[in-house]
Curated annotation (Swiss-Prot):
Gene3D superfamilies: 4.10.40.80
GO cellular component: extracellular region
UniProt function note: Iota-conotoxins bind to voltage-gated sodium channels (Nav) and act as agonists by shifting the voltage-dependence of activation to more hyperpolarized levels. Produces general excitatory symptoms.
Tissue specificity statement from the Swiss-Prot or TrEMBL entry: Expressed by the venom duct.
Record keywords, A-Z: D-amino acid, Disulfide bond, Ion channel impairing toxin, Neurotoxin, Secreted, Toxin, Voltage-gated sodium channel impairing toxin
Organism, scientific name: Conus striatus (Striated cone)
One of the record's GO molecular function terms: sodium channel regulator activity
Disulphide bridges, residue numbers: 2-16, 9-19, 15-24, 18-35
Domain of life the protein comes from: Eukaryota
Domain notes: The cysteine framework is XI (C-C-CC-CC-C-C).
Pfam families membership: Toxin_19
Record propeptide residues: 43
Name of the molecule in the record: Iota-conotoxin-like S11.2
Length: 43
């Protein structure tokens, strides 16, 4: 889920987006939009 509200990433898209592997990134990630290979914002 998202870092602050702990809701599923798909619930609040402006918080974070989930990749198939389940990690999250800011929706403003310009390198891989909505994706991350690290634990950033994963909780």
């Amino acid at each position: 889920g998202c870092k602050k509200d702990r809701k599923p990433c798909s619930y609040q898209a402006d918080c974070c987006n989930c990749c198939p592997i389940g990690t999250c990134a800011p929706s403003t990630n310009w390198i891989l939009p909505g994706c991350s290979t690290g634990p950033f914002m994963a909780r």
